[in-house]
């Protein structure tokens, strides 16, 4: 090997090491069930397109300076929190809960409390049968006490609603199945996240006036991108940047959902 070739090889190796050092690999866990438009496809495969929530997390990882594509790990819903605490994955979406294991890191404010701003924000609304003719002033949190609300399996807000004294039937896997139960009279309403008005409108249009939305929202919810605590301590700069990115880009989920909207 001549001198010039040797120098070029050394430069290439140095550049490769520098690129590797800039890349923080993060394993992102999410549900292995088809929940359009947020998570698409069943099983451990990641389809193309993968879903609006996957797109959002992808944008957050790159926007926060991790320096490389995330690795996607699809797991049953019940395993995600356990896998995160065990370090089998580095990050997963996690909703509001009464207790968080010490092995899980969440964003904190200056007082050391969980940061309510650096999260994904959503508003829950209720879909009901048009034939019930509920008044526009109906307060969902009060009206549905003693009744049954349907919600898709695995949603992070379910426990919060149960803690508020509501009866939640989460046996239906997705929104369509819950609305069918509503039409059959097996439940009295369906809880759904109102990320964008267009998303709700598309759902209502599908049922041609038989299902309507109550005007008053039910409750505002938050969903954090939680990290394994050991991963956080190893890469605090990137993780903190990701949490701040979520706060700065609050409307991003509604934006990425546009490509999953079916044409009118």
Give names to the regions the model predicted.
Residues 21-103:
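Extracytoplasmic small-molecule ligand-binding "clamshell" domains
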Residues 57-63, 131-134, 145-148, 222-260:
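Extended ligand-binding regions for polar small-molecule ligands
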Residues 71-143, 215-218:
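Acidic, polar ligand-binding/catalytic clefts
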């Amino acid at each position: 090997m001549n001198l010039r070739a040797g120098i070029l090889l050394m430069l290439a190796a140095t550049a490769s090491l520098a690129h590797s050092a800039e890349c923080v690999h993060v394993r992102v866990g999410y549900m292995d069930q088809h929940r359009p438009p947020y998570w698409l496809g069943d099983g451990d495969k990641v389809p193309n397109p993968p879903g609006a929530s996957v797109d959002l997390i992808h944008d957050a990882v790159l926007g926060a300076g991790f320096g490389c594509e995330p690795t996607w790990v699809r797991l049953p819903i019940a395993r995600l929190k356990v896998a995160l605490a065990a370090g089998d994955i580095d990050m997963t979406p996690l909703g509001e809960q009464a207790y968080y294991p010490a092995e899980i890191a969440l964003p904190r404010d200056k007082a050391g409390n969980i940061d309510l701003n650096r999260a994904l924000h959503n508003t829950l609304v209720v879909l009901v049968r048009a034939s019930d003719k509920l008044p526009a002033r109906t307060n969902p949190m009060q009206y549905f006490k003693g009744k049954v609300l349907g919600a898709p399996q695995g949603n992070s807000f379910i426990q919060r609603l149960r803690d508020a004294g509501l009866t939640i039937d989460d046996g239906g896997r997705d929104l369509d199945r819950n609305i069918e139960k509503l039409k059959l009279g097996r439940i009295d309403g369906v809880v759904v996240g109102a990320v964008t008005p267009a998303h709700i409108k598309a759902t209502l249009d599908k049922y041609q006036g038989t299902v309507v939305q109550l005007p008053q929202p039910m409750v505002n919810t938050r969903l954090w991108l939680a990290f394994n605590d050991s991963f956080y301590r190893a890469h605090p700069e990137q993780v903190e940047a990701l949490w701040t990115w979520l706060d700065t880009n609050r409307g991003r989920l509604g934006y990425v959902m546009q490509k999953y909207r079916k044409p009118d």
